[in-house]
A protein has these predicted regions:
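Extended, basic/helix-rich recognition subdomains
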Residues: 237-276, 304, 311-314
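An N-terminally biased module of ancient metal coordination in phosphate/nucleic-acid-related enzymes
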Residues: 1-81, 182, 269-314
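Short, conserved acidic/polar surface loops in the N-terminal third of protein domains
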Residues: 58-59, 77-85, 97-98, 129-131
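Conserved catalytic scaffold of divalent metal-dependent phosphoesterases
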Residues: 70-74, 83-88, 119-128
Length: 314
C-alpha cells in the first residue's frame, strides 16, 4: 500500500513570501485533481496535508480511501517553528491541534494521548526559519517519525534526514510536498501488505515502511514556481501588470536553493560533531516536569506511545 504523506491543495492558504502573501496562494492544486492524480499514480490511500487547514475534507470526504491529515506549524520550546505532519485525524482533533500548536509540549501530550501518528517534516530546511540545536533533542525524545524524503528537498538534505531518522530510531516517511500538480505523488511511502489506513500506520510503527520517489531539484523548484505564477495570473488577471517580475524567478529560486543546501550542510555537520543525546523532557526543560500530570506517561517507545490501534477513534 502506497501513500504520498505530504501534499498541498488550494486550502493551504496564502504564501509566506513577503510582498506576495496578500495576493498569491501557497498552492493552486484542486483537491479533486490531486486525489485523481494520486490514484492514477498508484496511491492506494490518499490524504492532503494543508497548512493548518482541513478544508479539503469537505470535497474529499466522499471517497472511502481518503483520510484526513494536516501540516501544523508548531512553536518549539526554543522559540523556533517546525512543520509537523499529523495523520488520520478527526475534525475535532484539528480544533484542539490548532489550539495547542504554539506549545509543543502541550501538543505532543495531546497527540500521544489520542494515539495519533505524527512526524517532523523537512527537518533540514530553512523554510520555517532558524533552528536551535535543542530542537533535535526534542525530536529525538518525543517525535515518532521524521520525513526522510521530501520531494522538494535536495538529495543531500534528504540523505541527512534519513540518517538522522536511523540515528534517533525514528520511523522514516516520504512525501512529495508538492505545491504544484506536476509533482504530486512522485515521492511516497509504502507499507507492503497493508490493506487499510490503520494497517498502513501500524506497519510504519512496526518498521515495515519504505520510502520511494523523487528528490527535489533547482529546475523542479523553478518550474513549480512558474506554475504557481501562471495560476495566480489566471485567478487575478490584474497581476499581469507585474508579470515582468517573473523574469526574476530563476534568480530567486537559485538563491533559495543554495540557502537550503547551506542550511542542510550546516546542521548535519553540527549534529555529526555532537554526541547523540536522547534526553527526558525535564533534562531539556528542568521545570517542564511540573507541567505533566502524575498519571500521564510519555511513550518514548513507538509501540507504547502510539499503541496497536493508530487511527483516532470516531
Amino acid at each position: 500500500m502506497r501513500c504520498d504523506l505530504h501534499v498541498h491543495s488550494v486550502a493551504s492558504g496564502m504564501c509566506s513570501t513577503p510582498g506576495l502573501n496578500r495576493i498569491c496562494r501557497e498552492s493552486y492544486n484542486d483537491a479533486v485533481e490531486v486525489y485523481k492524480r494520486l490514484r492514477t499514480l498508484g496511491m492506494a490511500i490518499v490524504t492532503i496535508t494543508d497548512h493548518d487547514s482541513i478544508d479539503a475534507v469537505e470535497i474529499l470526504r466522499k471517497y472511502p480511501d481518503f483520510f484526513l491529515s494536516e501540516e501544523v506549524t508548531v512553536r518549539m520550546p526554543t522559540g523556533t517553528e517546525v512543520h509537523v505532519g499529523v495523520y488520520d485525524i478527526r475534525e475535532r482533533d484539528h480544533v484542539e491541534i490548532q489550539r495547542r500548536r504554539n506549545d509543543f509540549i502541550s501538543l505532543v501530550m495531546y497527540l500521544t494521548e489520542r494515539r495519533l501518528f505524527f512526524s517532523v517534516n523537512h527537518v533540514f530546511s530553512s523554510l520555517t526559519g532558524h533552528r536551535d540545536e535543542r530542537d533535535f533533542d526534542w525530536f529525538a525524545s518525543y517525535v515518532p517519525a521524521l520525513e526522510a524524503r521530501n520531494g522538494q528537498m535536495c538529495r543531500k538534505a534528504n540523505a541527512d534526514a534519513a540518517n538522522l531518522a536511523a540515528r534517533f530510531g525514528k520511523v522514516a516517511i516520504a512525501g512529495s510536498d508538492s505545491h504544484a500538480i506536476a509533482g504530486v505523488g512522485l515521492t511516497h511511502t509504502e507499507v507492503p501488505g497493508a490493506r487499510t489506513v490503520e494497517e498502513f500506520f501500524a506497519g510504519l510503527v512496526q518498521g515495515r515502511g519504505r520510502i520511494h520517489g523523487a528528490h527535489g531539484g533547482y529546475a523542479k523548484l523553478t518550474a513549480d514556481v512558474f506554475s504557481i505564477i501562471n495560476s495566480l495570473l489566471q485567478e487575478k488577471p490584474w497581476t499581469l501588470a507585474i508579470s515582468p517580475l517573473a523574469l526574476l524567478v530563476p534568480f530567486f529560486t537559485a538563491g533559495h536553493w543554495l540557502n537550503e543546501i547551506r542550511f542542510s550542510r550546516k546542521w548535519s555537520a553540527m549534529l555529526e560533531d555532537s554526541e547523540k543525546r536522547t534526553q527526558h523532557l525535564w533534562d531539556v526543560a528542568p521545570h517542564a516536569h511540573d507541567l505533566i500530570p502524575e498519571h500521564f506517561s510519555f511513550g518514548i517507545s513507538l509501540e507504547s506511545s502510539l499503541g496497536p490501534s493508530l487511527g483516532a477513534s470516531a
